Amino acid sequence: MKTIKVTQTKSSSHRLKNHKLCLQGLGLRRIGHTVEVQDTPSNRGMINKVYYMVSVEE
């Protein structure tokens, strides 16, 4: 299955609880942390919810 590289670019402090949970679900822990996740609808939904805190490479 296709994978996507997701990097956290902004801090998660003072953010909505659901947005923090999305970052946790993607496996992101700190600014500059990069993970590879599978390209699934659920992961895409989490990325779309926190688009302003992450950068995405396909």
Curated annotation (Swiss-Prot):
GO CC list: cytosolic large ribosomal subunit
Biological process terms in GO annotation: translation
Keywords, ordered alphabetically: Ribonucleoprotein, Ribosomal protein
Domain of life: Bacteria
Quaternary state and interactors: Part of the 50S ribosomal subunit.
Keyword Ribosomal protein attributed: yes
Protein name from the UniProt record: Large ribosomal subunit protein uL30
Pfam families to which the protein is assigned, alphabetical: Ribosomal_L30
Record's keyword annotation contains Ribonucleoprotein: yes
GO molecular function: structural constituent of ribosome
Gene3D superfamilies: Ribosomal protein L30, ferredoxin-like fold domain
Protein family according to the UniProt entry: Belongs to the universal ribosomal protein uL30 family.
Native organism: Acinetobacter baumannii (strain AB0057)
